[in-house]
Swiss-Prot record:
<keyword id="KW-1283">Bacterial microcompartment</keyword>
<protein>
    <recommendedName>
        <fullName>Carboxysome assembly protein CcmO</fullName>
    </recommendedName>
</protein>
<dbReference type="InterPro" id="IPR050575">
    <property type="entry name" value="BMC_shell"/>
</dbReference>
<dbReference type="InterPro" id="IPR037233">
    <property type="entry name" value="CcmK-like_sf"/>
</dbReference>
<keyword id="KW-0120">Carbon dioxide fixation</keyword>
<dbReference type="Pfam" id="PF00936">
    <property type="entry name" value="BMC"/>
</dbReference>
<dbReference type="GO" id="GO:0015977">
    <property type="term" value="P:carbon fixation"/>
</dbReference>
<comment type="function">
    <text>Beta-carboxysome assembly initiates when soluble RuBisCO is condensed into a liquid matrix in a pre-carboxysome by the RbcS-like domains of probably both CcmM58 and CcmM35. CcmN interacts with the N-terminus of CcmM58, and then recruits the CcmK2 major shell protein via CcmN's encapsulation peptide. Shell formation requires CcmK proteins and CcmO. CcmL caps the otherwise elongated carboxysome. Once fully encapsulated carboxysomes are formed, they migrate within the cell probably via interactions with the cytoskeleton.</text>
</comment>
<keyword id="KW-0677">Repeat</keyword>
<feature type="region of interest" description="Disordered">
    <location>
        <begin position="200"/>
        <end position="219"/>
    </location>
</feature>
<dbReference type="GO" id="GO:0043886">
    <property type="term" value="F:structural constituent of carboxysome shell"/>
</dbReference>
<comment type="subunit">
    <text>Homooligomerizes, possibly as a trimer, interacts with CcmK2 in the carboxysome.</text>
</comment>
<feature type="domain" description="BMC 2">
    <location>
        <begin position="120"/>
        <end position="204"/>
    </location>
</feature>
<dbReference type="InterPro" id="IPR020808">
    <property type="entry name" value="Bact_microcomp_CS"/>
</dbReference>
<comment type="function">
    <text>Required for formation of the carboxysome, a polyhedral inclusion where RuBisCO (ribulose bisphosphate carboxylase, rbcL-rbcS) is sequestered. Required for recruitment of major shell protein CcmK2 to the pre-carboxysome. Suggested to be a carboxysome shell protein, but it is not detected in gels, mass spectrometry or by protein sequencing.</text>
</comment>
<comment type="similarity">
    <text>Belongs to the bacterial microcompartments protein family.</text>
</comment>
<feature type="region of interest" description="Disordered">
    <location>
        <begin position="252"/>
        <end position="276"/>
    </location>
</feature>
Length: 276
């Protein structure tokens, strides 16, 4: 007799699970997009296990999962990023302990995110954060795109994700690719036209453009004003001015010196008439 699972752990299309792993986050997103567009499956989410290894998990009927995985494996091998894949028919409910199933189901129940008019998304993965920042800056300056978020997958690998029209995303990814190669090391790029809602829901939620207004925090205690310190008064002392006395003494010395010095006798020049 099998135990009945709670309502939240009875997902739709509970026939099989498909799991595929790649060596790059852009590659796993592109692989997931191909699987969603090739069969009637639901993207549960991703698992990032470090060193750039990323796994996409899909759910649906066994035939749909098999068809989707075949398309996903071919896509990952085309990117040269394929690692492994498997199909789990009739998965048990306790697999949600290691798979992001409950989180995905809660997001489907809320259904608060809207993805209208998403023409394309672009992903650039670099080895090192400075190259990622430079690539994101180049993408935003080269085309009319919006930076959604960024992902870190371990071993220094990080991915920037932008969205916009197909032409703008293509131009932005090309500019970001050159900027990343100039600054550091480029690992992978991806442009996905017309992404489905399941794929957009699997990406991190974008940050709000405007920050929420924060209430003004008034101090709970008002500090008392400290009294000003008074400086002690200094005693006034008379200052003797000796300048006039010194000037008079110098004048008297100059007069005495002039009287003691004899006047020079006049110099007598010879008369030229006496020579005649």
């Amino acid at each position: 007799m099998s135990a009945s699972l709670p309502a939240y752990s009875q997902p739709r299309n509970a026939g099989a699970l498909g799991v595929i792993c790649t060596r790059s986050f852009p590659a796993v997103v592109g692989t997931a997009d191909m699987m969603l567009k090739s069969a009637d499956v639901t993207l549960i989410g991703y698992e990032k296990t470090g060193s750039g290894f990323c796994t996409a998990i899909i759910r649906g009927g066994y035939a749909d999962i098999k068809l989707a995985l075949e398309a996903g494996v071919a896509t990952a091998r085309q990117f040269e990023q394929y690692v492994s894949s498997t199909i789990l028919p009739r998965p048990q409910g306790n697999l949600e302990a290691v798979l992001p199933i409950s989180r995905r189901l809660s997001q489907e129940a809320m259904a608060t995110r809207s993805h209208q008019n998403v023409g394309a998304i672009g992903l650039i993965e670099t080895n090192g954060f400075p190259a990622l920042v430079g690539a994101a800056d180049a993408m935003l300056k080269s085309a009319n795109v919006k930076l959604i978020c960024y992902e870190k997958t371990g071993s220094g690998l990080c991915t920037a994700i932008v969205q916009g029209t197909v032409s703008n995303v293509t131009v932005a990814v090309e500019a970001g690719m050159y900027a990343a190669e100039r600054i550091g090391q480029l690992n992978a790029i991806m442009v996905i036209p017309r992404p489905l809602d399941d794929l957009m829901d699997s990406l991190p939620e974008p940050q709000s453009d405007s920050e929420a207004a924060q209430p003004l925090q008034l101090p709970l205690r008002v500090r008392e004003k400290q009294p000003l310190l008074e400086l002690p008064e200094l005693e006034r002392q008379p200052i003797a001015i000796e300048a006039p006395r010194l000037l008079a003494e110098e004048r008297q010395s100059a007069l005495e010196l002039a009287q003691e010095t004899p006047l020079a006798e006049p110099l007598e020049l010879p008369n030229p008439r006496d020579d005649q």
